[in-house]
Amino acid sequence: MNIHFKGTGVAVTTPFNGQTIDYNLFEDHLNFLINNNVEALIINGTTGEGSTLTEDEKLKTIEIAVRVAHGRVPVIAGTGTNNTQATIEHSLKAKALGVDSIMLITPYYNKTNQRGLLAHFTTIADAVELPVLLYNVPARTNMTIEQETVAALAEHPYIYGIKDATGDINYMKTLKSVVPDDFALYSGNDDAVLPFYEAGGDGVISVIANAIPAEFSDIYRTYQVNRHEAERQFNNLLPLINALSVDVNPIPIKALVAYIGYANGELRLPLVPMLEQDTKQLIELYNRIAKGSDLS
């Protein structure tokens, strides 16, 4: 399995039914995504509400995703926490279930320094011996992996890439200049994919692709042969992408995924549903795209 995918991976939502996960809907959604040409599944991350899943629930979603993917696309599980040893223990359980890669967020709350980040990620990679995707999302963790630290981590045989959700293209450009050519660089921001691709990025770990996987994943493939057409495709989807910013992720995308039938619209506290008027506007934009209207 080549875990260094090119194109669109999906940060998959987790459907709830009361106090439990609706595993049938989860499986249906995974098949929908794979059948609509996404290149990777990323589960139990921010968009999957991984921070409010129990360990048993996380392991069950991993088990299902590995079975459903069946080698068609890589499955990457968010296993990172701010507890190094707990992350190792959970990651080893994920490895035993056959996950292709783990995604490790920077430690949060017990904020460390760059030397601490280097030790944290290296210790986990050494212990788990599974491909590691770093996750840089300072807006949520108040911790940035500096480019020099990423470059040092890139020398580790199991650390193969990073999901960067800063939205800062200059950060990515500098990073590109200090890491090996085969180090994977993924955007965590749907609204920044074109400049990210122009700067040499390998793909995106997308939120909007939960609802429009075929349309959004086609942008990367089109970009390889016709940049102007890719820009047109992107601009047509941009109003819907921007509409997801009306509330905190994953609140808006879960409303949209519920509308297309792969969730029940439920969130786990402290997340609460969107305002009705915002949901209505989001669905109207989606329906216009579904009907082939040009929103650009």
From Swiss-Prot:
Q: Which CDD domains match?
A: DHDPS
Q: Where is this site: Part of a proton relay during catalysis?
A: T46, Y109
Which Pfam family name is an example for this entry?
A: DHDPS
Q: Which PROSITE patterns match?
A: DHDPS_1, DHDPS_2
- So what does this one do? Catalyzes the condensation of (S)-aspartate-beta-semialdehyde [(S)-ASA] and pyruvate to 4-hydroxy-tetrahydrodipicolinate (HTPA).
**UniProt similarity note:** Belongs to the DapA family.
Q: What is this protein called?
A: 4-hydroxy-tetrahydrodipicolinate synthase
Phylogenetic classification of the source organism: Bacteria, Bacillati, Bacillota, Bacilli, Bacillales
State the encoding gene.
Answer: dapA
